[in-house]
A protein has these predicted regions:
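Ferredoxin-reductase
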Residues: 2-92, 96, 106-109, 143-145
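FNR/FR-type flavoprotein reductase catalytic core
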Residues: 3, 81-239, 245
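A short, compositionally biased
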Residues: 37-39, 227-233, 271
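Short polybasic amphipathic segments
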Residues: 42, 233-238, 275-277
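Local cysteine-cluster metal-coordination motifs and their immediate loop/turn environment
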Residues: 122, 261-283, 294
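C-terminal accessory/binding modules appended to enzymatic or scaffolding proteins
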Residues: 231-264
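Single conserved hydrophobic/aromatic residue that forms the stacking wall/gate
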Residues: 287-296
Length: 296
């Protein structure tokens, strides 16, 4: 899948292992790259035709490069697997300019950052920014094994209140998110990024906290949660007058692309926001994840 007209052609400058099954990829261009803020992501258009969104982990002040952290997903459909097995330094890759759906509220009196697995990438970015601003913040990072905890050494350096939870060193016990949330002051802002079970635990724990103080970023599709929870529906296009039946087990994007409708998209999983469009009529339902899997 090629990028949009605003896509950048960047060179793969460096590929480096930073943890078990986690690579950091550095892209560089011929000139300064478009600016971004902590929590931003870029859509990477891979040579195999797949596009995926990855959080930027380098300092926004350094506009000479973009760096992303990519975990190897055993269920990969070609994104992380291609990067881990096929990407090489020197390749030219199309990348869309940064977008930010996980904005940091820099005015917060206190901030708590929680991450699981590769969800540490945008959290690491926020932690660096808060340290630069000399704000009060805590970081909780969870991983199954110490060898899989990406950026842990850097987080120890920038945050005096950094907590690393390793399941295998705690008799298999997961990070106690409800306890962390209960300990916070009323005006604390809370951020979380991680796999479905962690996100489910977090959203349950913050249910009574004002929405303006709760910030989440999903790295996985919600398709499993959606299946069986909503029925078929008709989708109408205002300009063309065309109408399509969207089955319960398909996404609107899939049906539109299948019928030759041009739609800006990237991850094709409802995560990155590239296909977001305006709804003129109808009611949308927010489907919450309920997936009792290991959280990282």
């Amino acid at each position: 899948m090629s990028g949009s007209s605003s896509s950048l052609k960047l060179r793969v400058q460096r590929i480096e292992w930073i943890a078990e099954d986690v690579l950091e990829i550095e892209f560089r261009g011929e000139t300064d790259l478009p600016a971004f803020t902590s929590g931003s992501h870029i859509d990477v258009h891979l040579p195999n035709g797949i596009s995926r969104s990855y959080s930027l982990v380098n300092d926004p002040a350094d506009r000479s490069r973009y760096c992303i952290g990519v975990g190897m997903d055993p269920k990969s459909r070609g994104g992380s697997r291609h990067i881990h097995t096929q990407l090489r330094p020197g390749q030219i890759i199309e990348v869309d300019p940064p977008l930010n759906n996980f904005v940091l509220d820099e005015s917060a009196e206190r901030t708590v950052l929680i991450a699981g697995g590769i969800g540490i990438t945008p959290i690491f970015s926020h932690a660096r920014r808060l340290a630069q601003l000399q704000k009060e913040f805590e970081v909780y990072q969870a991983a199954r094994e110490r060898s899989r905890a990406a950026y842990c050494e850097k987080l120890e350096e920038i945050s005096p209140m950094y907590h690393l939870h390793i399941d295998d060193e705690n008799e298999g016990q997961f990070l106690d998110i409800p306890r962390i949330v209960q300990q916070q002051t009323p005006k604390t802002h809370l951020y979380c990024c991680g796999p479905p079970a962690m996100m489910q635990s977090f959203e349950a724990a913050v249910a009574k906290i004002p929405e303006s103080q709760v910030h989440v970023e999903y790295f996985v599709a919600r398709s499993e949660a959606e299946q069986g929870q909503s029925g078929d529906f008709f989708l109408g296009l205002a300009r063309s007058g065309r109408e399509f039946l969207v089955p319960a087990d398909r996404s609107a994007l899939e049906v539109l692309l299948e019928n030759g409708v041009t739609v800006s998209n990237s991850c094709q999983e409802g995560i990155c926001g590239s296909c977001e469009t305006r709804v003129l009529e109808g009611t949308l339902s927010l489907i919450h994840i309920s997936e009792p899997t290991r959280p990282y």
